[in-house]
């Protein structure tokens, strides 16, 4: 039986195993508090997130279960990895992940990025997305603050709010809206993995320009800014809009012509412009895939088809539609924690 110690962080009781020491708060979100800590077993610095009251409602219990299942499934060099998980005597859940030094948002607000860094960061983002998408998973919330980077420029997509949480002191925090694909923003249709390619394209453009590409004040303004660059959506896209109100809104807008990307991104490499144009396409069916983007000439310095893996199996979403009581989710969660430690022990033996 693991031994637990208690400590107060920001008025919150952290009840963690003796394996972790030197807790320091690094962020707080709606669902939990994150601290950096020293892992006594490995000597590494880690991030420890406490999930607040995971079993207080069926919705929270299901959300926590989903996040754990996803992190266990998505094992890849460019995705944040789960190194430990435990449930305290108070029945709070703690996720332990790698700790990386910074994130892309902080980098972008501190200095312009040189071309080789833009290429390398984009390559790693797309390499991670290729794996995520092959597992039948959509990130849905890709943005610079969800992309963690260490001193070696290794990049990891921080998925599902489980790793580093937004620093409350961070200035100039950018809304998720800036990176949201039009088909999500205007609820046109059932969206798919292409929404992540749009977000990655927005991040790519921001790395080139040093500022957000589509900084909308609200969804209407956001859409207007997008059309100023991409022009009016083509008819085959407008025809897919299910909402009558959204359809009326889009049809009421004045016709706009697409601005040539070479004109917008005057100092960008022609290959960068070509790839960006393939990522930022109104019609999700015509957006380039992560796998094809990796093979684009712009990423040739890093592209290695033998080292861009896909998932062994598609993620099992069968639990998603289950409407279960908290106690059932709790039993399922304990089972997942147990299987994680059994799997971890097998890997180490």
Curated annotation (Swiss-Prot):
GO cellular component: chromatin; cytoplasm; cytoplasmic stress granule; cytosol; mitochondrial intermembrane space; nucleus
Top-rank lineage group of the source organism: Eukaryota
Modified residues (Phosphoserine): 175
Binding site for ATP: 26-34, 49
Segments carrying motif TXY: 171-173, 176-178
Keyword Methyltransferase in record: no
Protein's name according to its UniProt entry: Mitogen-activated protein kinase sty1
Natural source organism: Schizosaccharomyces pombe (strain 972 / ATCC 24843) (Fission yeast)
Gene of this entry: sty1
